[in-house]
Amino acid sequence: MQNRLSLFFLCMFFLITSLNAQEGMWIPSLLSGQNEAEMQEMGMEMTAEDIYAVNEGSLKDAIVHFGGFCTGEVISDQGLLLTNHHCGYRQIQSHSSLENNLLEEGFWAESHEDEIPNPGLFARFIREIQDVTPLILNGVKPSMTEKERQDKIRANIENVKSQFELGPFESMDIKAYYKGNQFYALRSVRYDDVRLVGAPPSSIGKFGADTDNWVWPRHTGDFALFRIYAGPDNEPAAYSEENIPFTPNHSLPISLDGVDEGDFTLIFGFPGSTDEYLPAIAIEQLVEEINPARIEVRDRALAVMDEAMRNDPEVKIQYASKFASIANYWKKWKGENLGLTRTNAVESKRAEELAFRKKLRNNEDWLATYGGTLLKLEDNYRRSLQLRKSDAVYGEIVNRNVEGLRMAGYIARLISFYEEGGDEAFRSFANRLVPFMENMYENYNAGVDQQLAVTLLEAYPDLMPKEFVPRVISENKNDLDNFIGEYYKLSKIPSKAVLDILKNDEPEQAVEKLKKDPLVLLVSDFDLMYRQDILRPLADIETEHDSLMRHYMAAQLLVADEDARIFPDANSTLRVGYGKVNGYEPKDGVKYLHQTYLDGVMEKYVPGDYEFDVPERLISLYEAKDYGPYAENGKMPV
């Protein structure tokens, strides 16, 4: 079984098992020149054109950007779409209620008519990827300031986009790669009618929940099925009962053969973001300062939500998707810190930097151009640490994890729009804000949100420099429970009364009412401090950082050895990774196999547990060893 594609690996852009380290996230249109020979030597029987082609069907035509935040794969000629359970979790949750709890019970449509629409969900296909670097950097000069450079690049991007001939329903996006040293245009088409077809219960699709997230061995049945629908002409169309299942240019065939150690495997998808080429000081600050602060905030937020969800089944449904979203990066940051510490990543980076500096010193031209870049970049990180850490904490508490504060921030922005642009500006923003807030309120519990506000604002003074703490918080630090309770009681945001004002009042009346709202006043105090003391100075430092990082990246590309594997950081664009399936040894005396089985699920099973419960039906199948054609030597692969 040497040369099969593993659909399981395609479904998850990053491997849970270990690849035989051919690291990289490569641009599909460049595989023939960069990677094809190596891939074929490793066992791939396809060609680069089988993976990426413009004028005929190829693997890329079966890979979609699912909702703009995940990867999905078309696995039938009727638009059936496979993705992860956690990627479809928000949609599954949105269709759940106490009476019809799809999260707990799962869902399987018995016909096309039973498939459930998901407003706002889309599937985007990449049609073509083109290198447009010379066009985007046309007229960009070394003597330009960073602002002049960015202004010129933005103008060039708009000019280039206007010159592309796009088909119906197509769009063009131009993305920076290698920290702004290269640019690629991505032509795509978006389908907006994507319906839920099937999902296992969370005790399978989310088995192990946060304890097992981002770690191995994993026993989660992390999958869900959707279907793309199109108009009668197979072109994108808004939801309609008249739409029909989409016929793709290519779909992935399903194999029941599984994978063996040593099999070649290909990963195709849309990874979010990475920072492969940071200097050592950035990694050090991330591990020691920024990640711990973000983890501390989310520790507190998750504890509040977890208690509320365990005590109230309705809250459990309301907050399931939010909890999973917050927990995902919380666990990732914890694992990131653990991995970077265990692998001595900072010391390894410093060794690379010594070698980098040595190469520069051996070439006068390189030294003249890039000799001071790394020193300046390190100085930039030292000067910006407290600002970047404070920005992260502020974002976690005020802009993300407390919805009452978040909505108050939007109202404060609406008031600013009115003060600057009058009735027209108010109505323009309000028309977008109302449906957004209505969507937030669908899964909002004022009591839970109030407790989140109290808990996180209690942590705020401990995580921020004193000068970044608004006086209203420092003065009420020892009585935040009552202080915040009174604000939530008097505010029109937790009660949803704000929607009536936005919908029914004239702009002037609405502004007069809303500018006196306690939560709006509180957030306005935060926002004034944030913009003056954090955002403005940080913006200047970040502009300098972006320039230095671009030069540092250019220098790394310039001095790299011929066989160096320098791939661009992930930026939510289509990429390819590849390697061989293997287990790995994370530490002394521990070896992980390449595959897990249902036996491991039952070993972890804890009856009634929040994370490790198992459905009765699955227990019965396990006890009867009733695995149908899916067994592997009498065992059921997960």
Language model: regions and residue ranges:
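Terminal presequence/propeptide segments associated with secretion/organelle targeting
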Residues: 18-638
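Bacterial N-terminal signal peptides
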Residues: 8-17
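Bacterial N-terminal signal peptides that target proteins for export
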Residues: 1-8
